Swiss-Prot record:
One of its GO terms (biological process) is parturition. It is found in: Cell membrane. It comes from Homo sapiens. It comes from the Eukaryota. Residues 1-409, 465-486, 549-577, 651 are extracellular. The lineage of its organism: Eukaryota, Metazoa, Chordata, Craniata, Vertebrata. This is Relaxin receptor 1. Residues 431-443, 508-527, 599-629, 673-757 are cytoplasmic.
Amino acid sequence: MTSGSVFFYILIFGKYFSHGGGQDVKCSLGYFPCGNITKCLPQLLHCNGVDDCGNQADEDNCGDNNGWSLQFDKYFASYYKMTSQYPFEAETPECLVGSVPVQCLCQGLELDCDETNLRAVPSVSSNVTAMSLQWNLIRKLPPDCFKNYHDLQKLYLQNNKITSISIYAFRGLNSLTKLYLSHNRITFLKPGVFEDLHRLEWLIIEDNHLSRISPPTFYGLNSLILLVLMNNVLTRLPDKPLCQHMPRLHWLDLEGNHIHNLRNLTFISCSNLTVLVMRKNKINHLNENTFAPLQKLDELDLGSNKIENLPPLIFKDLKELSQLNLSYNPIQKIQANQFDYLVKLKSLSLEGIEISNIQQRMFRPLMNLSHIYFKKFQYCGYAPHVRSCKPNTDGISSLENLLASIIQRVFVWVVSAVTCFGNIFVICMRPYIRSENKLYAMSIISLCCADCLMGIYLFVIGGFDLKFRGEYNKHAQLWMESTHCQLVGSLAILSTEVSVLLLTFLTLEKYICIVYPFRCVRPGKCRTITVLILIWITGFIVAFIPLSNKEFFKNYYGTNGVCFPLHSEDTESIGAQIYSVAIFLGINLAAFIIIVFSYGSMFYSVHQSAITATEIRNQVKKEMILAKRFFFIVFTDALCWIPIFVVKFLSLLQVEIPGTITSWVVIFILPINSALNPILYTLTTRPFKEMIHRFWYNYRQRKSMDSKGQKTYAPSFIWVEMWPLQEMPPELMKPDLFTYPCEMSLISQSTRLNSYS
């Protein structure tokens, strides 16, 4: 063996081993190699816009160029590159067409008469090869209007007002390859109208008013490759072979029509068809053999129709299919073996479809699948062998984390801690406070308990976020369908509804006692306890009803990772949507309106009673303090509920709401009331401040006595709360004299300003 031969073999084997070192890297299921290095990354780190491999390999080949785009590049681009239609165009830019209309432009053998208000086809010399008559006023094409243009190859008639075309209108156009009739008013094409167009390859008739077509319509189109009938009003396709006179047809686009069903005979002669687009029609039924003749089909687009059921073997003959779009159909169930025959499938779109029976078995046979699109990113866990799975997030969660944003992951703990601490602090203080108004104290404790549940809800969400950190996608679907998620979601609704009802109850109490001090009805202890119990029972009923009937409410709380049913899902039943609207735009909106109206009336009433006061300056100061307190109470309610009302209202109008909105609302906006209620209703009130001062004074006195070695008996830690009256003569300070706020308000209406100062 010569040295040259040895060098040749070394070179060949060197390249082989070098290549194999990267391509033969074996990664476990759900992981994919980083090009030519021995490193594997999980599915969620591929095609995420970040160079996680270090050599950009995880971001290479992320574009989905399968289906029509690949077919276009493969056939049309290469074909027209090889067959240049205008070899003289660059060499002869001057006009070579004789008798050109004054308003038209000419270059070489191309004529441009766009937007020249032409009402008929102009008469020019017969050597023209391209004629553009767009944006004119042409209403009809009479017989033989193009008969002299034997060399015409491109004809543009878009955006005219064409309503009728004579059967002989295109007679003589033996060289025509592209015909554009888009954006006109054509309602019918007579059979044989294209009879002389034997070389026509592109026929574009989109955005017209065609209501029916038949095989004879396309008689003579032996060379047709592309037929576009988008956005017409076709209601059905013929039950005869559609491609009978179009044997070379590769691309058929019927998007945006009103087609209801597809017949078995329609595509029986379309054996060369590679792209079939049927999206945005009204197809509700498919026969098992509908696509059987289309054995060369590369892309099938059935998105945005009304298909509810897929026959089990409907795709069995589509062995060459590389792209399938079934998105946004109300498909009830997908068979486990639905895609078994699509061995070459590379792109699968299932967006907008709730796959209740999803399982890995559905996608396991699709070994060439590189792109898959779901309604929920949680479904990506059922296709771990697919490199690119979308969506990566729902705005709330991501493939890695239950809470996608680092800000949310931090603040869920901060907000929950503040909420729980504030409310527990107030609850724990109550046993040490001797209050003359026990009923009000009871209501405040009840409110704190409800608000504390919101903090517990956020703690649980934060805890599960920690538990699933870095691998949430593996657990996402099970988590949202779990009992834990259902209970956590119901806990949030329980907290929300009880808090809303209690705030309304407390507000109405204040309203009656201040606005109608001499007519207020005293409910008494028994009635107050009954009201509080009824509020909690109502909250429990509202929160747990969705758990009682799964068939009616479906997965009511499990529509997102935070288990909060803020906005409607497409898959929700009508009853569940009505129920959700009744809560947020019924109970809560009514309560918010009552609170705003009541506080406005209270302030107005106090302001009116202060007009006759002698100490005007003092009254103005007290009114300002009162106004500030009322403002902050109403403002926090508005800050919490107005965004929620807006989101719910928009979802009712079917406006698409980003998932990020839901997560920010749940973590930052919804807990506002729960976190601030202890501050507004307890910690900033005058009795609390006086109690703190008294406690501090007693503490300093005791410390002073102890330092002098004297024994002292300091008064016990007491907070005497007089709500809404907080300044009373000593002779009226008797436990049995005033037991309810309304009675105290009878003494003097002018002293009401002290209630909130």
